[in-house]
Amino acid sequence: MSKLILTRHGQSIWNAENRFTGWVDVDLSEKGKEEAKKSGELISELNIKIDISYTSYLKRAIETLTIILKTLNLSMKFNTAWELNERHYGSLTGLNKEETKKKIGEEQFKKYRRSWDVAPPLMAKDSNYLENFSPLNDGIPKNKIPFTESLKPVSYTHLTLPTNDR
């Protein structure tokens, strides 16, 4: 029987700082690297075989998968798909979540985070964070690069996964 394993990347340095990350390409924290290793150990303990793997373009996800595969003693190519990139948080990108909640209020904060079709405000076209996205944007159709996202477009984007072996 086939099995589907879904893993989230390990803790990133911005997760540790409680910041909205989205498409900003930040590294894993040491804790995140350990979490990835533990995921690999659990997969091994459960004797689950991996035949194919996918990850987003984000280095924290690629590093998580690489650590898992290394822990499993697997040296296999994996597929990258920008469609698996984390949700884009628009103008909230880089902000501390607790400070943002205090500033905009609990209700609006929840809408931006959990609402199906309410996206945070657009990221400004002159945002410093846009430079961080440029390497990620290679191979992504320009009309598909978001400046913010609600959960709705993210869930639809994840339904189709082209392959790009690494």
Regions found by a protein language model. Name each.
Residues 1-4:
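Extreme N-terminal starter segment of soluble prokaryotic enzymes
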Residues 11-26:
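Glycine-rich N-terminal loop/short-helix segment of MobA-like nucleotidyltransferase
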Residues 22-37:
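Short catalytic helix/loop segments, enriched in acidic residues and glycine
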Residues 25, 142-153:
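Glycine-rich phosphate-binding "P-loop"
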Residues 32-36, 53, 100, 154-156:
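Conserved anionic group-binding/transfer micro-motifs
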Residues 39-147, 161:
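Phosphate-coordination/substrate-recognition cap region in phosphate-metabolizing enzymes
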Residues 157-163:
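Conserved small/polar residues in nucleotide/adenosyl-binding loops
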